[in-house]
Regions:
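Feature captures hydrophobic
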Residues: 1-126
């Protein structure tokens, strides 16, 4: 459980760093307003805010996020979020029932685009 919580906290820091050091990422988030959360079925999670070109997060869940990613448990969440081939891991998790998505799917796709900025320079997103 601690690894999952730490990974969600670290995700915030990685997104903040990408916004600060990558002008294309900064432009991607500059006018975006989004609230989402990543959690387990048991209720452990973190909610994230993207507003005014900034990314922030807090431990715990909120009532009405624009979308939610729910993992079966913390171990599955950690394994999927930290997988080298995240796209395949996400698709497999959805297929296997280890991950469910709810809320605004347009915002989920936008967030997927944001995570592309976390990839090392020169790594293909396709």
């Amino acid at each position: 459980m601690l690894k999952f919580k730490f990974l969600l906290w670290a995700l915030t820091k990685l997104l903040q760093r990408a916004v600060k050091h990558n002008p294309a990422c900064a432009k991607y988030v500059e006018r975006k307003e989004l609230v989402f959360q990543i959690q387990t079925l048991g209720g452990t999670g973190r909610h994230f805010h993207i507003r005014n070109g900034r990314v922030t997060s807090k431990a715990g869940l909120i009532r009405n996020p624009q979308f939610t990613m729910t993992f079966r448990d913390a171990a599955k969440g950690f394994a999927i979020l930290s997988a080298k081939d995240s796209k395949d891991a996400f698709l497999a998790a959805l297929h296997d029932g280890d991950l469910s998505l709810s809320g605004n799917f347009v915002e989920i796709m936008w967030f997927q685009g944001l995570t592309d900025y976390l990839k090392p320079a020169g790594q293909s997103t396709a």
